[in-house]
């Protein structure tokens, strides 16, 4: 048996449902990284510092779920655009030659990255490439984000990065929540009216305009929208990413396809954000990788692992 010299894991509470070990270990196999191993550990907010202090230099990195994506901030240095801007990091990479920025000598220096945003972008790029679709580049397109929680913030950041999108409509049950969305869009999206935030009663009207749509509300919460999409005369022309990956496909994805649109599941976002994490933790890449860096063999193995 090969000795494990490099350890990584995903942290969260609960964490039993996580697919990250399946994805990361499949990537290690594809990349012939035989002495790398990835696991999962149930770690809550009060346990984070103690867990970090318990690690040894065989540890290379961590994946983090909410609320640890925010809790990790005092222990590390944000190193890519959206980790800095959003102050949310789902990826921690250790440097054992230095100590923690907060002065704790029992914790190594930690570089923090946000790969959620890039994962969303790459999921759309992959969908376009496999269907030979050339997206717009003139910021004339419209994106619709369903929900306005933490995932919606990452979705908005991904829309900012898409050269096709000039206007984002956020559809939410409580439009007044998440005051960070409007200033984020206004700061980064070079258009006269970068964002509108409306109630759920405007969902179908908004989705009819969507070149890109991203559902960020969890569980079965979007099933009502799915039923409304099936009404006579409703047609979709854009591409939907539903971040929910269980069940697959969701009712929203099924309805979207029935009404003429393209729908991709949340497992694609999960796959690509995990792939970028692997590159960062293993040192293959040290920033947000360009589209050309996507390893097709690695992608195929990860897709197979998720079946």
What are these regions (language model features)?
Residues 12, 108, 114-117, 124-161, ...:
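Glycine-rich adenosine-cofactor-binding loop
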């Amino acid at each position: 048996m090969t000795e494990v010299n490099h350890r990584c894991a995903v942290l969260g509470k609960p964490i039993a449902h996580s697919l990250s070990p399946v994805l990361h270990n499949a990537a290690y196999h594809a990349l012939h990284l035989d002495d790398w191993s990835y696991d999962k550990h149930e770690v809550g907010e009060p346990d984070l510092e103690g867990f970090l202090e318990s690690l040894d230099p065989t540890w290379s990195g961590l994946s983090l779920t909410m609320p640890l994506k925010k809790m990790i901030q005092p222990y590390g240095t944000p190193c890519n655009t959206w980790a800095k801007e959003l102050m949310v990091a789902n990826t921690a990479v250790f440097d054992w030659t230095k100590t923690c920025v907060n002065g704790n000598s029992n914790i190594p220096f930690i570089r923090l990255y946000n790969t959620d945003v890039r994962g969303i972008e790459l999921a759309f790029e992959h969908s376009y490439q496999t269907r030979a679709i050339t997206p717009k580049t003139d910021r004339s397109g419209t994106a619709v984000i369903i929900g306005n929680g933490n995932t919606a913030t990452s979705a908005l950041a991904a829309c900012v990065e898409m050269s096709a999108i000039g206007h984002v409509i956020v559809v939410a049950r409580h439009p007044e929540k998440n005051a960070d969305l409007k200033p984020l869009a206004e700061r980064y999206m070079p258009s006269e009216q970068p964002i509108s935030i409306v109630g759920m009663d405007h969902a179908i009207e908004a989705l009819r305009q969507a070149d890109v749509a991203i559902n960020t509300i969890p569980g079965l919460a979007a099933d009502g929208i799915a039923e409304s999409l099936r009404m006579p005369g409703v047609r979709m022309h854009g591409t939907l990413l539903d971040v929910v990956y269980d069940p697959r496909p969701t009712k929203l994805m099924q309805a979207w396809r029935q009404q003429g649109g393209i729908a991709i599941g949340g497992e694609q976002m999960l796959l690509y954000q995990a792939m970028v994490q692997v590159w960062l933790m293993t040192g293959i890449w040290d920033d947000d990788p360009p589209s050309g860096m996507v390893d097709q063999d690695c992608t195929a193995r990860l897709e197979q692992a998720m079946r």
